[in-house]
Amino acid sequence: EWIFTAPPFWVIIIVIAAIAWLAKGWKLAIGSAIGLLLVVSIGQWNNTMQTLALTIVAVIIAILIAVPLGIWAARSQTVSTVVRPILDFLQTMPAFVYLIPAIFLFGVGVVPGMVATVLFAVAPGVRLTELGIRGVDREVVEAGNAFGATPGRILRQIQLPLAMPSIMAGVNQVIMLSLSMSVIASMVGAPGLGKDIIQALSRTAIALGFEAGLAV
């Protein structure tokens, strides 16, 4: 969190704009800079950086769980059979329900919010990774086998590159769900914009709620 909150706001804006420029071009960079300057102007910079930090860490953890598990499920029907009902269960539970076991196990604070966010976001990453690996043309895989490629090499050089669009769609879903859940996680003590949103709801503070919602 201190990585985002300690430096001056203009340093963070420049870094994020540069990353956006390298990733997608100048339009995204300008849009990111304008959006962050708007956050500064409404006085929500620290809360936004806290929410961003929570979201980034949750996304990284969720991806580190989802992608390997999705690959394993794609390569083993037994694992897929075991994992599928668990993912169904995770995706059918309301977002607020994730907070209950997190509070029971970890108390109130950042950790239960992080755990709840990861659990809420991980399922689509697993599903779309498995779908992408299973969707690779079987003939391409058989051609790799015919040339003597090992299973690991087939995975790295054939299946993962061809499945990347589906995997990235899963990563996109993980990011969106993590962002939405990181706001709800403020109900159990996680810092960030969610605290202002909850206060706005409890006090009917329309202006505060609008500012926090705009920052999100």
Question: Which residues are covered by each model-predicted region?
Answer:
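Interfacial loop/helix-cap signal at membrane boundaries in integral membrane proteins
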Residues: 1-8
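Hydrophobic, membrane-inserted alpha-helices
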Residues: 10-18, 32-37, 97-101, 161
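Transmembrane-helix boundary motif in ABC transporter permease subunits
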Residues: 18-23, 35-46, 58-87
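Juxtamembrane membrane-interface segments at transmembrane alpha-helix termini
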Residues: 41-52, 61-67, 126-134, 194
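Generic hydrophobic transmembrane alpha-helix motif, especially the helices
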Residues: 54-57, 61-67, 71-74, 87-121
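Transmembrane alpha-helices
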Residues: 115-119, 151-185, 213-216
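Short cytoplasmic-facing helical segments at TM-TM junctions of multi-pass membrane proteins
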Residues: 125-173, 193, 197
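Hydrophobic alpha-helical transmembrane segments of polytopic membrane proteins
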Residues: 193-216
